[in-house]
Each structure stands twice: as structure tokens, then as C-alpha cells.
Amino acid sequence: MMLITTSHRPTRRTRSFGHDLERVFPNSLYLTRGKKTIQELLMEAYDRGYERLLILNVWKGNPLKMTFIKVHPEDWGYLGYLYLHGIKLQREMGFKGLNPIREDMPLVVTTAKRVGWDHIAFAQVFAELTTGKFVPRGDKSLTYIADKYDTDVIAVIERHPRGMVINFYRLDVTKDRPVGPLINVKIWIMEDGRRWDYKEALGIKVPRREKGEGQESSSENRD
């Protein structure tokens, strides 16, 4: 599915976040960044058969941004960015030591049952960024969806006062509650121009980002 790493000099919390994502993205791997460049990471991801490279960018000790990159030896490119309000790690949700999923199964992306069009649009975007499968929720239970698509892991887009959140369920662990990590998204930007900002959604005027501004200008956060 994807190779997961961080910007240079990550904090312990950001590394823990990367390991948590490895446990909910099927057949994915968290890799310590070290001194590797973007090009070296892309080649490693390609050699391992991954379609995506995910870089977790840090700001003031916490994960600030998730950068998704298409993996291809000749046609790689930035796909999109999630700007975060905050995260909650698996251990903070009562789950420690979960095993990564080392078998082929889809990451199903859906929504809570009563959400707006913004949440549905983001669920489709998140599926695109992760190579997951978007499934409209309707009145279906998560167990029904998991059984139908033969998977143990579902990402659910839910409401939040400051944006929206991604909650991960591992039905092989528990069918009663999410295992984490919980990701609070305040802005998402796609390279093709699609975007969403929770302040704009609330009618708060904010400076408009120019095309390509989603990419970091500093070498530490870009790389």
C-alpha cells in the first residue's frame, strides 16, 4: 500500500504516529528516515512495490501535515496534503502493541451515518490519497461493510467542531470502538486544485493559498 516516513529530525510522538499508521494501513511499512532524500525514499518505495509514499511533517514537536506522493520511477508527483489540528495515538485510546496487517486487504474508507457533503467528499479524497476503497455508508454497519469487502480495517470520516476527524477501526481487534490513531484534519489540499478549509466552511475569511503552496518551502519540512 504505502511507505510511511517522516521529515528529518522527527519527534518521538511523530515516530509513534508513523508506527500507528503502519498498523492500520494494510501491507504498509514505517521506515526511519535518516538522511534519505525524497528520491531515495521514492526508489525504496518502488522497489518494495508500494504505490504511495507518505511523509509526516513536524511542527513544534507535533505532526502538522501528511504529504502523499505518487510512487513511479519516471512519473512520481505530489498528490495532496492533510493539515492537522492534532492526533490521538493508539496507546492514548487504550490500544498498545497492535500487529501490522501483513496480508492483502483493502483499506475501506467511509463516513459516519449522518454527515454532510464535505465529509463524503473528503472520504473520497482520502481513499484516493491512500489507494483505499471509498464505500458510501448509508445505513450499513461497519461489520457489514467489512464482511462485504473482505477487510479488517475501516477508516471512518466523522464530524468535529474544528474540521473533521479520521477514526480507524480494526475489526480483528474489536468491533466495538476505534483503535486509533484519531486524526483531526483542518485543511486538505489536492494538487489538482480541490481543497477544503474548516474556517472557510464556517464562513470565516482566510487568505487563499496559491496553487502549489501545499508543498513546504523549507528543506526540512519538504524533505
UniProtKB/Swiss-Prot annotation:
Lineage of producing organism: Archaea, Methanobacteriati, Methanobacteriota, Thermococci, Thermococcales
HAMAP family: BriX
GO BP, sorted A to Z: rRNA processing
Role summary: Probably involved in the biogenesis of the ribosome.
Cystine pairs: none
Keyword terms: Ribosome biogenesis
Nucleotide-binding in keyword set: no
Protein name, per record: Probable Brix domain-containing ribosomal biogenesis protein
Brix domain ranges (all copies): 1-196
GO-annotated molecular function: rRNA binding
Gene3D superfamilies per the UniProt record, alphabetical: Probable brix-domain ribosomal biogenesis protein
Record-linked SMART domains: Brix
